[in-house]
């Protein structure tokens, strides 16, 4: 079993500068939101459904394919922890969020089955990468 430090040390940071948006719809609109993601073929997005809302983190241009959102927050970059996360390892997000908090960088996080995704303000991306780079294997800017 790996420790959080060991796992992060072999993890590349996959960076998409964006801009990304975080948007929210009524839960009943989840089908339309997912259809919009399929139509725009972004390849990158995070969708979460709970009893209060359907939320999505997606490239800003993808909003054109979506039903009107009731809330939109703009100006995010997306950082993906590029190594599959081991579910028995504790402290990965704590280490990442601690480093960003120490640098004063706001953070949102979402987990997929095997990877964690972080979203930070675009204007703080360089600060975020400077804070995270000592923990991780490398930084790869994808877009």
Specify the residue positions occupied by each region the protein language model found.
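Regulatory modules associated with amino-acid/nitrogen control
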Residues: 1-99, 103, 127-143
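A cross-kingdom feature marking solvent-exposed beta-strand/loop segments within repeated
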Residues: 103-116
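A generic "binding-loop/recognition-motif" signal
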Residues: 114, 124-125
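Short glycine/threonine-rich loop-to-helix capping motif typified by GTGT followed
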Residues: 119-122
């Amino acid at each position: 079993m790996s420790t959080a430090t060991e796992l992060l040390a072999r993890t590349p940071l996959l960076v998409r500068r964006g801009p990304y948006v975080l948007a929210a719809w009524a839960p009943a609109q989840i089908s339309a939101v997912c259809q919009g993601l399929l139509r725009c073929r972004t390849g990158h997005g995070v969708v979460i459904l709970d009893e209060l809302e359907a939320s999505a983190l997606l490239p800003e241009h993808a909003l054109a394919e979506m039903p009107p959102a009731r809330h939109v927050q703009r100006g995010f970059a997306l950082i993906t922890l590029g190594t599959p996360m081991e579910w028995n390892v504790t402290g990965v997000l704590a280490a990442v969020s601690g480093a960003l908090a120490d640098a004063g960088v706001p953070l949102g996080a979402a987990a997929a089955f095997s990877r964690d995704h972080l979203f930070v303000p675009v204007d703080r991306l360089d600060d975020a990468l400077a804070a995270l780079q000592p923990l991780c294997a490398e930084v790869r800017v994808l877009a």
